[in-house]
């Protein structure tokens, strides 16, 4: 689908209304530092003659400026997608970027009015905390996710899955497991929901084929889905900065040393470097109380594509 210039101009004007500086906090998310940005600009603290340069303050203000515009960009791309496509769907794995998108969709009102549907694939091998967390954010934001799982198995019925496909399928044939538990339910979910625009959390920092993605991709000629990549220009640090700024509900495994998560069978936390603490689930690097504790560089590097998963 192609949009005329007037549509984009209208969307751009509307996006300003949703700028973080104009955001009214609700119980769904509390902006802790939006006051740092006023009237669309931030005054940087430059050192006067004889005064010491406050580097930490400068960095904090610079990060706030960056995050402000990243938010505006992300909300603009979501608004264009949800307002111009009747069936925008967000496949949500509840990783850090996904909870940010969930919060942005809430701020725009698209979870409440149904202009964006949330889709979740339950592989039956997720961490127990993952589906529990889904129930929490459904209650928190007031939406109901569309959950899909292996074909021919009732949602949430692990015993039925084991009986039909075998509890050890992933050990015996990992390619078949991926097809049965991930690929087929994902594709079926998009088709069932009549998806014409897929919202996702892909970002350039993940590299490889994602290194040059833009915030929006038109549907391929001949068929396919349009894609909205609201976090295309975000780093993982930006993502956690946003979670901290608005106190966004996030996966409990972050507090146990997991920068990212997938199936429990093949996701590990950051290993502890303390010989007195051999348990990797008690590593000293984690996200807790709205901040990264431990080696921040290690945390963000370990969460990169194909690491720790």
Question: Where do the model's predicted regions map?
Answer:
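Intrinsically disordered, low-complexity segments used for protein-protein interactions
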Residues: 20, 25-26, 44-46, 271, ...
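Proteolytic processing junctions in secreted/extracellular precursors
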Residues: 17, 38, 43-48
């Amino acid at each position: 689908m192609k949009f005329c210039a007037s549509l984009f101009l209208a969307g751009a004007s509307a996006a300003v209304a949703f700028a973080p500086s104009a955001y009214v906090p609700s119980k769904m998310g509390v902006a802790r530092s939006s006051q740092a940005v006023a009237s669309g600009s931030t005054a940087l603290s430059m050192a006067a003659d004889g005064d010491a340069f406050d580097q930490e303050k400068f960095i904090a203000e610079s990060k706030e400026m960056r995050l402000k515009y990243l938010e505006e960009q992300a909300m603009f791309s979501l608004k264009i997608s949800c307002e111009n496509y009747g069936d925008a769907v967000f496949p949500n794995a509840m990783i850090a970027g996904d909870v940010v998108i969930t919060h942005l969709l809430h701020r725009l009102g698209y979870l409440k009015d149904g202009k964006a549907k949330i889709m979740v694939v339950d592989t039956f091998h997720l961490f127990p905390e993952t589906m529990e967390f889904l129930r929490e954010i459904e209650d928190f934001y007031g939406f109901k996710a569309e959950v899909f799982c292996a074909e021919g198995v009732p949602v949430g019925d692990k015993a039925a899955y084991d009986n039909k496909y075998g509890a050890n399928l992933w050990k015996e044939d990992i390619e078949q497991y991926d097809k049965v538990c991930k690929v087929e339910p994902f594709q079926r979910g998009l088709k069932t929901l009549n998806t014409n625009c897929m919202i996702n959390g892909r970002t350039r920092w993940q590299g490889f084929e994602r290194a040059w993605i833009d915030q929006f991709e038109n549907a391929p000629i001949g068929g396919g889905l349009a894609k909205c990549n609201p976090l295309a220009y975000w780093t993982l640090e930006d993502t956690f900065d946003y979670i901290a700024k608005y106190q966004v509900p996030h996966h409990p495994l972050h507090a146990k040393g997991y920068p990212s998560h997938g199936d429990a069978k093949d996701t590990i936390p950051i290993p502890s470097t303390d010989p007195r603490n051999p348990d990797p689930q008690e590593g000293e690097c984690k996200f807790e109380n709205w901040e990264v504790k431990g080696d921040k560089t290690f945390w963000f590097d370990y969460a990169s594509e194909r690491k720790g998963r």
